[in-house]
A protein has these predicted regions:
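A compositional/biophysical signature of low hydrophobicity enriched in polar/charged and small residues
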Residues: 1-364
Length: 364
């Protein structure tokens, strides 16, 4: 049943919606009529798929349908960043941090390091990652700011189980291979033209790639062929739906961090990544004020379910001492967008930073 309130559609997904969402998170086929293709898999016609998707987008359950690119494979440098602020300064600091076009995720979390964001800079950045972070730290008056780049990627696979059939402690049946990060070849000018189109939100119409192809000055098969090549080269992980976790019913977002001895990292990292509730698993650097080396992101429908999944990981790995782990929950979302590549915003931000001008703020 759907109702409207305050101009926003409220929609409770039914079983068919949930099956569709699972399929779309796994990936949309790179074919001329992708909605008809996914409908055929689910016993729906194209019109029904488009209607359901329209409602799910109006209800903000589906954020967008687009290519999911690998930042590093495209030549960008990126990192998770942790920052510490007094509570009274946090929101203004978050607006300044969010004004950088390479900040796609920006959250308040339950820790002394209370602002967590992801930062990416272009391949030809004049500042680079470290100096960009330092400019943000100075502009926001951070008490501390730590760069936490990926040292080892064990897993990245954000696919929420919309059907509810998956137990909180479920594990992969076979070890998932470590993700590849591109082929080391920089995108060409033609590649960038295709990427600029594929990173948009896919229109809800029978042949959506045709419209994009016309905008790029190519035919639809050329665009789709380029997209398939990007997948083969690991530029693109998949073309898929990105959900609003909370609106999809996953209200708990716990970042579980673990103190793991150096000689156990390569054993325990993959074992943590095997849990289906874990969407991301990374090894990151430690600091005197940050001793945790492995990060696991857990999404669940409730905090209790999140804690159950984390307890199962602790039991599996033997890290049962509470002093060797922490769970940081997201309590406020300042910014969450799909990162846009090869756009002028990065250079414009650096122009301001290098000139010593005031930095832009997210939300104006």
């Amino acid at each position: 049943m759907t109702t409207t309130a305050a101009g926003r559609l409220h929609h409770k997904p039914d079983e068919a919606d949930r099956e569709l969402l699972n399929q779309l998170q796994a990936g949309l086929a790179l074919v001329r009529e992708p909605y008809a293709e996914v409908g055929a898999r689910l016993g729906m016609d194209e019109e029904e798929v488009l209607g359901r998707l329209a409602r799910l987008k109006q209800a903000a359950i589906v954020r967008q349908l687009s290519a999911i690119f690998d930042t590093r494979a495209l030549g960008y440098t990126s990192s998770l960043v942790a920052a510490r602020y007094p509570d009274e300064r946090l929101f203004e600091a978050a607006r300044i941090v969010g004004g950088h076009p390479g900040v796609s995720h920006n959250y308040r979390r339950t820790h002394a390091f209370n602002l967590w964001y992801t930062l990416a800079v272009e391949p030809d950045s004049r500042l680079g990652l470290q100096a960009t972070m330092e400019r943000l730290a100075a502009a926001t008056g951070a008490e501390s700011m730590r760069l936490l780049p990926t040292l080892k990627l064990y897993k990245i696979n954000v696919q929420l189980d919309m059907t509810g059939a998956q137990p909180t402690d479920a594990k992969e049946e076979a070890p998932r291979p470590a993700p590849t990060r591109g082929d080391g070849v920089a995108p060409t000018a033609d590649d960038k033209r295709m990427i600029a189109v594929l990173q948009r939100d896919l229109p809800l119409e029978p042949r959506p790639f045709d419209r994009w192809a016309a905008a790029a000055g190519v035919d639809a098969e050329q665009l789709l062929s380029a997209a398939r090549v990007f997948v083969a080269r690991s530029y693109m992980r998949r073309f898929a739906a990105v959900l609003n976790h909370r609106r999809a019913g996953f209200g708990a977002n716990g970042m579980a961090v673990w103190r793991v001895p150096e000689d156990e990292l390569e054993e325990l990292g993959p074992r943590m990544a095997a849990f289906k509730a874990v969407s991301h698993c990374y090894r990151r650097p430690t600091y005197p004020d940050w001793p945790y080396s492995i990060f696991t992101m857990v999404h669940a429908r409730s905090k209790d379910a999140c804690e159950q999944a984390i307890a199962a990981i602790a039991e599996e790995t033997g890290i049962t001492d509470p002093g060797r782990r922490a769970v940081l929950y997201s309590t406020y979302e300042f910014k969450k967008i799909r990162l846009m590549y090869f756009t002028p915003g990065y250079r414009e931000w650096e122009d301001l930073a290098l000139a010593g001008a005031p930095l832009p703020r997210w939300g104006g």
